[in-house]
């Protein structure tokens, strides 16, 4: 059984390192569609919205209301591949969707990422060595577990959607292990 995680100090805790017999488990490291390359900072914060409705829209509204007041450049990706929306409000750029290549570049060009705590996203962030605030989708127990586990490991900041404070999380994330 191939497992996309590190053999030691895994990214998914008990989800990828079960207590039962692991003789047939082969840890292949994180998998990602993205590639790390040289980049220059363009955004202070990149917020990636995803998840099932209505949580996707709730998350977007919370992020937009806070990012619109942010002093530095921010990008919010709405997670709507069917739309072609673009807007610029103060220092906040809003785009409905980015291709994989564009998203790879946007992540690399951002100081801090705010996103859901899905396992594929976590592997992408680790591959690109990017710091992030993880906000699990409410009711998604795997995401809640991963965000809590990785926060305890001091890899990422974890905040719940209802009480999300970007300014507090930004300050707290300065104390976490720098991945880049």
What are these regions (language model features)?
Residues 1-27:
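Active-site-proximal region of nucleotide-activated glycan assembly enzymes
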Residues 22-23, 71-72, 130:
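A short helix->loop->beta-strand "cap" motif at the edges of active sites that frequently abuts
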Residues 26-29, 94-97, 155-164:
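Short acidic-hydrophobic, aromatic-tinged amphipathic segments that line or gate anion-handling sites
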Residues 103-145:
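A donor-sugar binding/catalytic signature common to diverse glycosyltransferases
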